[in-house]
Design a protein with these regions (language model features):
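Glycine-rich Rossmann-fold phosphate-binding loop(s) that bind the pyrophosphate
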Residues: 34-39
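Glycine-rich FAD pyrophosphate-binding loop
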Residues: 46-70
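Glycine-rich beta-alpha-beta "Rossmann" dinucleotide-binding loop(s) and their flanking helix/strand
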Residues: 232-236
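Short loop/edge segments at beta-strand edges and connector loops
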Residues: 58, 111, 145-147, 193-195, ...
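Extreme N-terminal leader/targeting segments of oxidoreductases
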Residues: 1-29, 44-53
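Helical element adjacent to the flavin cofactor pocket in flavoenzyme catalytic cores
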Residues: 163-220, 224-231
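Dinucleotide-binding Rossmann-like beta1-alpha1 core, especially the glycine-rich loop
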Residues: 73-153, 159
């Protein structure tokens, strides 16, 4: 079984440079990691708690340096996940909200659609199961195609059948990350690059983060470290 979705060329014009200033010795909330999850978290915290001192600690000198800008850039519609699961609900609602977010901020996001193609008879039951999941999850416009309909949607693909998801799209997540960072900063958050967190220690008022540039005491911390999360968990 295969899939096809087009992509957008990543923008080279968006600045993802992090601040070079050292992190504060104290803050109310620390966010560890300035990928798209950490930046979205900082933006939301700054909006909900405008008086809080929020500091984002990022190991690299630039934002979104790892998974965020090295993925396929696909906005997933929610086909694959177990119906009723948190991941399914968040994927469907998150895709819808992301399109709106990008449109409001002038970030190019293309609803290119996706076809998941069955090329062998043995793959047809799995394709039908994905179609059932898509319907159960409320994926907009998803439908099964026979071979003729598949050729109409994508003439360069050959298969026995396909699941078409017109709600699937692509976006430059570097641009999304830059917009989130700008919103977080506008809300009062600070973002500090070149500051890998090495570990944390609970205190009577929260926790103390040890990082390459010293220590930061925070009342609370949100760890959004992606592939580094397991190492931070061990070091906690």
């Amino acid at each position: 079984m295969g899939l096809l979705a087009t992509s957008l060329r990543p923008s080279r014009a968006v600045s993802l440079a992090a601040d070079t200033s050292p992190p504060p010795a104290e803050c109310d909330i620390a966010v560890v990691g300035a990928g798209i999850v950490g930046l979205a978290t900082a933006r939301e915290l700054a909006a909900r708690h405008p008086d809080a001192r929020i500091a984002v600690l990022e190991r690299e000198p630039r934002l979104a340096a790892h998974q965020t800008t090295h993925s396929s850039g696909v906005i997933h519609a929610g086909i694959y996940y177990r119906p009723g699961s948190l991941k399914a609900r968040l994927c469907v609602s998150g895709a819808r909200e992301l399109y709106v977010y990008c449109e409001e901020r002038g970030i190019p996001a293309r609803r290119s659609g996706k076809v998941i193609v069955a090329t062998r008879p043995s793959e047809l039951p799995r394709l039908e199961e994905l179609a059932r999941r898509a319907e159960a999850n409320g994926v907009q416009g998803a439908r099964l195609l026979d071979a003729g309909e598949l050729r109409e949607v994508e003439p360069h693909v050959h298969g026995l059948a396909a699941l078409h998801s017109p709600a699937t799209g692509v976006v430059d997540f570097g641009r999304v990350a830059a917009a989130l960072a700008a919103a977080a900063r506008a809300g009062g958050a600070t973002i500090h690059g070149g500051c890998p967190v090495l570990g944390s220690t609970p205190t009577d008022r929260g926790l103390e983060l040890r990082h390459a540039r010293g220590k930061t005491r925070a009342r609370a911390a949100v760890f959004c470290a992606g592939a580094w999360s397991d190492r931070l968990a061990v070091a906690a």
